Curated annotation (Swiss-Prot):
Source organism of this protein record: Oryza sativa subsp. japonica (Rice)
Gene behind this protein: HEMB
Active site: K293, K346
Subcellular location: Plastid, Chloroplast
Protein name in the entry: Delta-aminolevulinic acid dehydratase, chloroplastic
Transit peptide per record: 1-45
Catalytic activity of the protein: 2 5-aminolevulinate = porphobilinogen + 2 H2O + H(+)
Lineage, top ranks: Eukaryota, Viridiplantae, Streptophyta, Embryophyta, Tracheophyta
């Protein structure tokens, strides 16, 4: 006989395509539904042997009908004997502990562990930092294996294509600016035809649905390598720097940035940038403030990537002291009052306590930046076979989420999303 089965070529395509169910412990990426031609029917020949299939029998050898008859009559088979696994030789014979609560009961199987998992992670939680430069070719970054200064057109677009394929739709831009364009006042930062505005326009033209974050700071544009204008006595000028940052943020918003991210740590810059954006009509452009940015030693590879090391001194007069905890509350209160939409902690893993502090004291979304030093340490450990790179990568991201981060800026974003989608991580 012939049976009629309804199907669609689109459905067949989805079944044959890559599975994206995700890593069991972390969550998964969302598949994009496909559309196809309307449903049609096909006749499928079923053989006579299939029509006359033998009766289904229970493990005992009886048919289903016989089992049902026994159940109606109240005759139930005896349960199999409970066989306890043997303990190894030499295990002491003891009376079980008189415990009412045994937390291990909820961990004894993968299904139970998944049911009670408190924290999850998905590609939607990840923001991929992108290093860009004026050249056409991608240039590898020696201190950050797997990362490149991307050619601002071809290499950049290819990286975004690949990231979107695994569910990463948020990106933050960091430019390597030619020395010839750097100055003490960092005027190139608000050039509407500069590298960052051009890149924003390119990305928004090709991928209008992505979220573009931008960095608001003068260090990539400063001949001194600092986040602000440097006075002749070496003091970083706060208010004059904020004035420049406002122009930079407006230029980025004009190009199409979704979120501007002041990382400079100047006092009062969030409120000033909010006022400047609103005055230009950019009421819907968000501000992600680097609220608790510490003067950390974990930034080394990043500064190599952008050639943005300070020409003298350090950044301790404006970035936070790594020994301080409560000070983060002062910065949080100020940024909230000035109109920040997202609060960020940088670095990430060494400052889990600060992430939790902000999470417990603010209703705003919390971001964590897993910085270049954190990334490079995991990469180096994996390359030397001292750790399992993939497992440590995923655990580190889960820890940031567990501490309270809603989103994570990480150079592992695409690699981690591959894992979440059940693909190879490299």
């Amino acid at each position: 006989m012939a049976s009629t089965v309804s199907f669609s070529p689109a459905n067949v395509q989805m079944l044959q395509g890559r599975s994206c169910h995700g890593h069991a412990a972390f969550g998964g990426c969302s598949a994009v539904p496909r559309t196809g031609p309307r449903m049609r029917s096909v006749a499928v020949r079923v053989s006579s042997e299939q029509e006359a299939a033998p009766a289904v029998r229970a493990p005992s050898g009886r048919t289903i009908e016989e089992c049902e008859a026994d159940a109606v009559a109240g005759r139930f088979p005896a349960p199999p004997p409970l066989v306890r696994p043997k303990a190894p030789e030499g295990t002491p014979q003891i009376r079980p502990l008189d415990l009412t609560k045994r937390p291990r009961r909820n961990r004894r199987s993968p299904a139970l562990r998944a049911a009670f998992q408190e924290t999850t992670i998905s590609p939607a939680n990840l923001v991929l930092p992108l290093f860009i430069h004026e050249g056409e070719d991608d240039a590898p970054i020696g201190a950050m294996p797997g990362c490149y200064r991307l050619g601002w057109r071809h290499g950049l677009l290819d990286e975004v294509y690949k990231s979107r394929d695994v569910g990463v739709n948020s990106f933050v831009l960091f430019p390597k600016v030619p020395d010839a364009l750097k100055s003490q006042s960092g005027d190139e930062a608000y050039n509407d035809n500069g590298l960052v505005p051009r890149t924003i326009r390119l990305l928004k033209d090709k991928f209008p649905d992505i979220v573009v974050y931008t960095d608001v700071a003068l260090d990539p544009y400063s001949s001194d390598g600092h986040d602000g204008i440097v006075r002749e006595d070496g003091v970083i000028m706060n208010d004059e720097t904020v004035y420049q940052l406002c122009k930079q943020a407006v230029s980025q918003a004009r190009a199409g940035a979704d979120v501007v991210s002041p990382s400079d740590m100047m006092d009062g810059r969030v409120g000033a940038i909010r006022a400047a954006l609103d005055a230009e009509g950019f009421h819907d452009v968000s501000i992600m403030s680097y609220t608790a940015k510490y003067a950390s030693s974990f930034y080394g590879p990043f500064r190599e990537a952008l050639d943005s090391n300070p020409r003298f001194g350090d950044k301790k007069t404006y970035q936070m002291n790594p020994a301080n905890y409560r000070e983060a509350l002062l910065e949080t209160a100020a940024d909230e009052a000035e109109g920040a939409d997202i609060l960020l902690v940088k670095p990430g893993l060494p400052y889990l306590d600060v992430i939790r502090l902000l999470r417990d004291n603010s209703a705003l979304p919390i971001a964590a930046y897993q910085v270049s030093g954190e990334y490079s340490m995991i990469k180096a450990g994996g390359a030397l076979n001292m750790i399992d790179e993939e497992k440590v990568m995923m655990e580190s991201l889960m820890c940031l989420r567990r501490a309270g981060a809603d989103i994570i800026l990480t150079y592992f974003a695409r690699q981690a999303a591959n894992v979440l989608c059940g693909m190879r991580s490299n």
